[in-house]
């Protein structure tokens, strides 16, 4: 005797189940926070004159200007400390400005940069250099060009926009703080 509950095809059942699953999770997708993930942020391309304009625009603050790249091992060591320092001193008058020296014309290199930013989620603006040619380095700092264009490179500016510290190596959090705190105290 034949069963009245005989299944002739599982295809409609599977499609119906899939539709129910999508319907069930769709309210979660709608109610998720609207903030875009950090790795989708746009990175503005900067020329040397833009870097100088960023320093001038932050007159009255201590500017911590750092150049780095995702392929730079010391940069990976230093970056978490820069984030800690930025979070600790951002309300005290420190502005961190980061410029990536990844190749902005290479989609995979720029993609690596965006991925890294998504993973680290820095609380400061990150730009990308317009060029990796000597003119960019010279335009930012003749000293940097003369010293071999190494990374990471940091320049720290006082509240008047005068460069008071220059490093072409990774800094520790303690070194950053020992440079920044006296500049914050000087008004």
Name each model feature, range by range.
Residues 79-121, 133-141:
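Structural microenvironment flanking redox-active thiols in thiol-disulfide oxidoreductases
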Residues 42-63, 86-89:
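A short beta-strand-turn-helix
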Residues 61-63, 68-71, 150:
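Short pre-active-site segment immediately N-terminal to redox-active cysteine/selenocysteine motifs
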Residues 1-10:
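N-terminal secretory signal peptides that target proteins for export/translocation
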Residues 120-122, 129-179:
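Thiol/disulfide oxidoreductase modules built on the thioredoxin-like
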Residues 25-45, 115-118:
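N-proximal helix/coil linker or "cap" segments that precede and/or mark the start of modular domains
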Residues 14-27:
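Bacterial N-terminal signal peptides
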Residues 64-65, 96, 154:
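Hydrophobic beta-strand anchors of alpha/beta hydrolase catalytic cores
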């Amino acid at each position: 005797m034949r069963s009245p509950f005989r299944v002739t095809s599982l295809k409609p059942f599977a499609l119906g189940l899939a539709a129910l699953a999508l319907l069930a999770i769709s309210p979660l997708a709608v109610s998720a926070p609207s903030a875009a993930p950090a790795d989708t942020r746009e990175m503005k391309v900067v020329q040397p004159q833009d870097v100088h304009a960023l320093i001038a625009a932050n007159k009255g603050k201590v500017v911590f200007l750092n150049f780095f790249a995702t392929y730079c091992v010391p940069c990976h060591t230093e970056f978490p400390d820069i984030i800690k320092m930025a979070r600790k001193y951002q309300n005290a008058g420190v502005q961190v400005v980061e410029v990536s020296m990844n190749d902005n014309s290479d989609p995979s290199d720029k993609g690596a940069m965006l991925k890294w930013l998504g993973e680290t989620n820095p609380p400061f603006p990150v730009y990308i250099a317009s060029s990796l040619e000597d003119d960019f380095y010279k335009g930012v700092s003749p000293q940097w060009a003369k010293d071999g264009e190494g990374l990471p490179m940091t320049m720290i500016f006082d509240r008047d926009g005068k460069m008071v510290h220059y490093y072409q190596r990774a800094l520790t959090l303690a070194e950053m703080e020992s440079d920044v705190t006296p500049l914050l105290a000087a008004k």
